[in-house]
């Protein structure tokens, strides 16, 4: 994938990003052979899906970003490749956590912090400016399990599909941006 062709990425270090993406793909391939971390067929599409939010939302003021149910790193890892924010990834699966920790070392990501626990079990030491999650669970239960990480200024950015509108019942302050079948939902 040629990232320099996208206008919304023009202000980022795409050479460094490309190098880290290459490391990511090699490491994922190696881990997937043993641990079956993900069934994704088109990694490039999923990487693009992870960073497309930068076209819709300004992350520049976010100091701490929490990602819930990080799995194989979509979307948080690719945002961490581009942004200076501290990323806190919550993933209880030991195999996925091992992958993320290895990736952190291989890519020299000092802004990546990985927690092998469910977010609701975390004894917080920070409040997140942004909380991200990609298709983990419905919105309302997600908001509830993140109580210990959020305050009145926390913004949720959620990668969702076509069922999003049913999930937004009783949620008042939100925006939705669309790219193909993906719905990026920002809940304030």
UniProtKB/Swiss-Prot annotation:
It catalyses: guanosine(527) in 16S rRNA + S-adenosyl-L-methionine = N(7)-methylguanosine(527) in 16S rRNA + S-adenosyl-L-homocysteine. InterPro entries: rRNA_ssu_MeTfrase_G, SAM-dependent_MTases_sf. S-adenosyl-L-methionine binds at residues 69, 74, 119-120, 134. Signal peptide: none annotated. NCBIfam families: rsmG_gidB. Specifically methylates the N7 position of guanine in position 527 of 16S rRNA. This is Ribosomal RNA small subunit methyltransferase G. It comes from Campylobacter jejuni subsp. doylei (strain ATCC BAA-1458 / RM4099 / 269.97).
